[in-house]
Every structure is written in structure tokens, then in C-alpha cells.
Amino acid sequence: MKTLDENQAPSRQTPESHRRGAEKLSRIPVKVEPGAPLRKPDWIRVRAGSGDEVRRVKRLLRERGLHSVCEEAACPNLAECFGHGTATFMILGDICTRRCPFCDVAHGRPAPPDPAEPERLAETIALLRLRYVVITSVDRDDLRDGGAAHFAACIRALRTRSPALSVEILTPDFRGRMEIALDLLAADPPDVFNHNIETVPRLYRQARPGADYRQSLELLARFRDKVPGVPTKSGLMLGLGETLDEVREALRDLRGHGCEMLTLGQYLQPSRDHLPVVRYVPPAEFDELAGYARELGFASVASAPLVRSSYHADQQAAIIGR
């Protein structure tokens, strides 16, 4: 019987069901040509994921049958977040129905939603004594509601177990199921609604096959219409070949659709089979874009090379009083 490595996410040890790399990306419309990667600049420094607190959080996730996007997507901030006892939880399994070539989450045929997951999640978060939590998911194009009912069930379980907890959700685009999904989430709303547009519209075909830029903007706007008291949040990764003018236009689009919170970070290639990094954006440009975003009226902006959607999400939400 195969023994799993406790330090590695279970999905990374079962390649027969969890496809990654070339096997995952073989059917995308724009083929990735592996090449020599750009050398990482000095400002991209990632700590190794070790230490007692990191091991404790990983062990807790394994024991509870839960997943974190920190591990599944190979986030560069894993050691920092796990080291402080925090994690961004990924619900609805660890297998995605899409094959986005920037993302390291596994592709395959997912299992049905686990009805016991919301309660296990609530118990784990209470055990960690978290005050702020981010819940995300894989894409579930196989489900009639895109997984929205499961998001709502998790929010209800969290509110019941930890009434003082603030909950941010980072959702997929609910392609073809937007109204059903929004009705479910409006009945059990989070404290922050996050959906990333990821990149500029020109790069969607190669970076987000199966997704639509305008639909992502519409999702943010429609949620705001249904639940006007809950702020919306979105983010982009830079370094895929976009221009600064294209990024500025995307920021204007987000503000035009009522988005209040923003994250901007550097794209990092998970493997040579993924989309290559076209450019490492210097910190000064992230600062410049942060200033531009604030001029547009974003209430909360996190913009730096290693910023990710949920990185210091509690601090970002506190700026607008969530």
C-alpha cells in the first residue's frame, strides 16, 4: 500500500486522478511551448515551507479531510501564512473541471460535494481560533449551481460555530449558472465577495480558456446589486504579457462595475508546462498601479510582487471596516 507524504498535498501524490502539467494542459486551445524560464529577480524571494506551525496546519488539514489553495496552487506565501496558523480553505474537493494554464490546481473528474465538509470546516476554523477566513473552491462546471449551494452551506456552518468570524469567499465565475448561484449566495452572504478577473481581456483565450472577461465583471456587479452592503473584490496577476495601459483599463472596468477592493501580484510559473512569465514587474510599477487604483476610488488596494488574493485579506478588509 502506498504511503502518503504528510508534507505534500495528497493530490500531488495521486497523478492518476489529479492531472497536472503537460497531462492537464494537453487540450487547451493555445498550446504552451516549454522554454527556458526567466531568471527570478532579487525581489522575488520565497521562504521554504517548513517549521512546526507549517507542519501543524498541514497535519490538521489531512486529519480533517480538508484542502487549502495554498498547497494545491503552490502559493509562494504558504510558509508565511501557515507559519501564522492561517490558511485559505478550498472546498468542493481538490479536482478542477477546467485546465487554466496559469494554475497548478489539478484537473480531472471531481467527486460529488461532501455534505459533511461544511461542518468539518467550521470545526477546524474554530479549533484554529481564526477571526477572518477566506473560502475558495475549484471550478465545478459539473454541478447545476456551480457549487454555490455548498458555499452557502459552509457560510451557514461557520456563522453557527463562530458568530464573530468574518468570512470572505473567492468564487469561480459560475459559468452559465450565474443567477442560480447569486440567488443562493444572496440568501447567505459572506462579509466580502471576491472573484478574480485574473488578467486583461486580450489574454483571456490563452490564460483563461472557458472563461469570459465580461461575464466576470458582470458577476461582480450582479452580486453587488443583490447584496449592496457587502463589498466586492477582484485581482489580476501581472507578467503574462499585458501592457500597463491594458491593466489601467481593466482597473477602470472593475471600478465601473462597483468593485471596491483590489489585489495585484506577479504571476509565477508553477512548472515549465504552464504559461511562461513574460516579464517580472518591478515593485515600483506595482506601487504606481496602486496609486492609480486609489485615484480611481478603490477603497482597499494590495499591490506587490508576492500579493495573492487572500494574502493578508483580514488586514485589507479591515481598511473598509469589514
From Swiss-Prot:
> What is its subcellular localisation?
Cytoplasm
Q: Which family does it belong to?
A: Belongs to the radical SAM superfamily. Lipoyl synthase family.
The protein's UniProt keywords, in alphabetical order, are: 4Fe-4S, Cytoplasm, Iron, Iron-sulfur, Metal-binding, S-adenosyl-L-methionine, Transferase
* InterPro entries from the UniProt entry: Aldolase_TIM (IPR013785), Elp3/MiaA/NifB-like_rSAM (IPR006638), Lipoyl_synth (IPR003698), rSAM (IPR007197)
**Which pathway?**
Protein modification; protein lipoylation via endogenous pathway; protein N(6)-(lipoyl)lysine from octanoyl-[acyl-carrier-protein]: step 2/2
Question: Which portions of the chain have biased composition (kind: Basic and acidic residues)?
Answer: 15-26
Membrane-crossing ranges are none
Protein name (database record): Lipoyl synthase
- The Radical SAM core domain is annotated at 82-299
Instruction: Return the PANTHER family for the record.
Output: LIPOYL SYNTHASE (PTHR10949), LIPOYL SYNTHASE, MITOCHONDRIAL (PTHR10949:SF0)
GO cellular-component term (any): cytoplasm
Q: Name one GO molecular function term.
A: 4 iron, 4 sulfur cluster binding
Superkingdom as given in the UniProt entry: Bacteria
Q: Which PROSITE patterns does the record match to this protein?
A: RADICAL_SAM
Q: Does the keyword Methyltransferase apply?
A: no
Record region (Disordered): 1-30
Composition bias (Polar residues) maps to 1-14
Q: Which Pfam families match?
A: Radical_SAM
Q: Does the keyword Iron-sulfur apply?
A: yes
- Give the EC number(s) under which this enzyme is classified: 2.8.1.8
Known catalysed reaction(s)? Answer: [[Fe-S] cluster scaffold protein carrying a second [4Fe-4S](2+) cluster] + N(6)-octanoyl-L-lysyl-[protein] + 2 oxidized [2Fe-2S]-[ferredoxin] + 2 S-adenosyl-L-methionine + 4 H(+) = [[Fe-S] cluster scaffold protein] + N(6)-[(R)-dihydrolipoyl]-L-lysyl-[protein] + 4 Fe(3+) + 2 hydrogen sulfide + 2 5'-deoxyadenosine + 2 L-methionine + 2 reduced [2Fe-2S]-[ferredoxin]
The free-text cofactor remark is: Binds 2 [4Fe-4S] clusters per subunit. One cluster is coordinated with 3 cysteines and an exchangeable S-adenosyl-L-methionine.
